[in-house]
UniProtKB/Swiss-Prot annotation:
CDD domains, sorted: PLDc_FAM83A_N
Organism taxonomic ancestry: Eukaryota, Metazoa, Chordata, Craniata, Vertebrata
Residue ranges, compositional bias (Polar residues): 314-327
GO cellular-component term (any): cytoplasm
Gene name, Swiss-Prot/TrEMBL: fam83a
One GO BP: epidermal growth factor receptor signaling pathway
Protein name: Protein FAM83A
């Protein structure tokens, strides 16, 4: 038997690399069948069968001790069991799914709504110039943890977070304040394997679903490896990034843990411009395969509507004066457009009876204020409604003295009808009677 046949693909390359005089072989990126056979044996029979297959294939040990424990801990049985198997007409066993393959359409869970695809006009990240900035943990002037916290605190509309581990209570407080105090909708995707750490933190802080009115917490896994027997295990989420207002991205090695902010060395990238589209697409794909955990289960996409806060703080930037006038509060203040346009002022007589105010529309929820991140559009103050223009200028007047209209220059709004006090005034002045009749000379 040729000795080279007893060597697996990886073992052969290692032996050639150790031999200085061996001929350099061409790089091979093809599929390794020995690795698949060994992994299937690990799922079906355990470590002993795994080592046996490696020995038969002449391959090196592919997995570390931690990787072996991870696979053994996360093995999932196939969707069917022996109890559900029935014997067919030809004596072969058949399961209820008619196939050993996994059919997502047979799932009992509700499907995640199809995510909206951006149009060229709606992509907010295309409005900014493409740039990239790097932050290192050793740079004390631009601390990585503080950079992330500033990003959360400066977000004004929506925040999308994909994280492997979330146990930092201070960052979690920033997220809660953004959602509950500033009405920012937060999409939080967490790794399913470390989700229990996040739930434990919420239990310690006594945070429940009722405190997450604007937060959607969902779990997601990595890719799934499935053996021929149907047993499988899922990978972890090692991607970590934050999308703020769909305009820039923070990504790197940083995890939302206390150790990452204090002792672990990490780096952080900040991207803006066209590259944000890649992160947006990745987040939407992961969101579609995620499962609800806490907070809102399935936020319905609604058109964005601006809302005036009770504290007077707008959800937009303080430099935008249009954000204080909304369609939900048409009587909150006079719009700028209606003041500058004199042609829309009412010419009908002003009534002295109180004008009943129409019932204001209910306060819009954050789901109505901020669309699902898949259907984002720029928040622009809606134009003033013409139906309300007359109500803006109807005032309740008290009877004015007769001298008011002679000493005040603002009586051009006065009605042409005679008011009651006008009849008590003389129609003609005595000083002008000499011009009432023509004189003959």
């Amino acid at each position: 038997m040729n000795k080279s046949k007893t060597f697996g693909k990886i073992k052969k390359r290692i032996e050639e690399a150790k031999n200085k005089w061996a001929r350099l072989s061409k790089a091979d990126y093809s599929y390794n069948e020995s690795a698949r056979l060994a992994t299937d044996a690990l799922l079906d029979g355990g470590v002993e069968d795994y080592q046996k297959v490696l020995s038969e294939e002449g391959e090196v040990d592919l997995l570390s001790g931690d990787e072996l424990q991870y696979i053994l801990k996360n093995i999932k049985a196939p969707l069917y069991s022996n109890d559900n198997q029935t014997e067919g007409e030809n004596g072969s066993a058949a399961n209820g799914n008619k196939s050993e393959s996994y059919y997502p359409m047979n799932s009992d869970s509700e499907p995640v709504p199809t995510l909206h695809n951006w149009s060229a006009e709606e992509k907010p990240y295309l409005k900014d110039k493409s740039s990239a900035t790097v932050y290192f943990q050793a740079d004390k002037t631009n601390n990585v943890r503080e950079t992330i916290r500033r990003c959360i605190n400066k977000t004004t509309q929506a925040l999308a977070i994909l994280m492997d581990e979330f146990t930092d209570a201070e960052i979690f407080c920033d997220v809660l304040e953004a959602a509950n105090k500033r009405n920012i909708f937060v999409y939080l995707l967490l790794d399913a394997n470390k989700l229990h750490l996040f739930i434990q933190m919420c239990e310690k802080l006594q945070v429940r679903d009722l405190h997450m009115t604007n937060i959607s917490v969902r779990s997601v896994t990595g890719d799934v490896y499935c053996a021929k027997s149907g047993k499988k295990f899922a990978g972890q989420i090692n991607e970590k990034f934050i999308i703020s207002d769909w305009r820039f991205v923070l990504s790197g090695t940083y995890s939302f843990t206390w150790l990452s902010g204090q002792v672990h060395r990490n780096f952080l990238y900040k991207f803006s411009g066209d590259v944000v589209e890649l992160f947006d697409e990745e987040f939407r794909n992961l969101y579609a395969s995620s499962k609800p955990v806490m907070g809102l289960k399935s936020p319905a996409p609604m058109a964005p509507v601006l809302r005036r806060e009770d504290s007077g703080m707008s959800i937009m930037s303080d430099s935008n004066p249009e954000s204080i006038n909304t369609t939900s509060e048409p009587f909150s203040s006079i719009s700028t457009a209606s003041i500058s346009n004199d042609s829309q002022r009412p010419k009908s007589p002003v009534s002295t009876t109180p004008v009943p105010s129409p019932p204001s529309s209910p306060v819009k929820s954050p789901l109505q204020r901020v669309n699902s991140f898949h259907g984002y559009s720029s928040l622009i103050s809606p134009p003033p409604q013409i139906n309300y223009q007359s109500n803006y200028y109807q005032r309740n007047y008290a009877p004015d003295p007769p001298s008011f209209f002679y000493n005040n220059n603002a009586n051009f709004y006065r009605s042409f009808r005679m008011r009651q006090e006008d009849f008590s005034m003389p129609r003609f002045n005595q000083g002008w009677r000499l011009f009432s009749r023509a004189t003959m000379t």
